[in-house]
Amino acid sequence: MSLNYIKNFYEGCVKPPTVIGQFHTLFFGSIRIFFLGVLGFAVYGNEALHFICDPDKREVNLFCYNQFRPITPQVSFSALQLVIVLVPGALFHLYAACKSINQECILQKPIYTIIYILSVLLRISLAAIAFWLQIYLFGFQVKSLYLCDARSLGENMIIRCMVPEHFEKTIFLIAINTFTTITILLFVAEIFEIIFRRLYFPFRQ
C-alpha cells in the first residue's frame, strides 16, 4: 500500500490536473532548474575569491563582500525560492495520494477543487514574497564598482571594491526575475483554467 502512495504522489507531482500545471512542472520548471544549476553556479561559483577591494586586505575583502552580498551565493536563494514555491503543490499531491484521489477527480469534486485552488493561491503568495525579497536583496543590476562602508573596521573612509563578472550577473538577475514573473503569471492562469474547466464540466455530463 505504501508503494501505491508513493506512485500516486509521484504521478501527481509530475502530472498535475491542469494543462498549465503540467507545462510549469515538466517544461518551464525543468528549464529553470537547468538555468540555476548550470549557468548560475558558473557565474557565481568563485565570486568571493575574485571580489577585490582597495586596500587589498583579506579582512577588508571579506567584510565588504559580506556587506555587498548578504546571502551567498545568490543562486542558493534562487534555488530555495524555487523549492519553497513548489512545497504547497507537493503537500496537496501528498494529501491526494494518502486519500487515493485520482488526478481526474480533483477538478470534478468541489472540495478537492477548492483545496487545489488554495494550494495554487499559496504558491502565488510565496512566489510574490520571494520575488519582493529577491528585488530587495539583489535589485535588478550588478554594478562593476561597489562602495563599501568600512568605518566599523576602523577604516574612516569608503572603500572601493571591484565586482567580478558584473555584466553576466546582471543578465542572470534579469533572467531570474523574468522566470519568477512568468511563474506567477502561470499560477494565475492555472486558476483561470480550473474555473473554466469547472464551469465547462457540467455541460459535458
UniProtKB/Swiss-Prot annotation:
Q: Where found, per UniProt?
A: Cell membrane
Q: Which Gene Ontology molecular-function terms are recorded? A: gap junction channel activity
The residue ranges crossing the membrane are 24-44, 77-97, 113-133, 171-191
Family statement drawn from the similarity comment of this UniProt entry: Belongs to the connexin family. Beta-type (group I) subfamily.
* Protein's recorded name: Gap junction epsilon-1 protein
Its Gene Ontology biological processes?
cell morphogenesis; cell-cell signaling; lens development in camera-type eye; organ growth
**Native species:** Homo sapiens (Human)
Q: Extracellular side of the membrane: what ranges? A: 45-76, 134-170
Q: Name one Pfam family in it.
A: Connexin
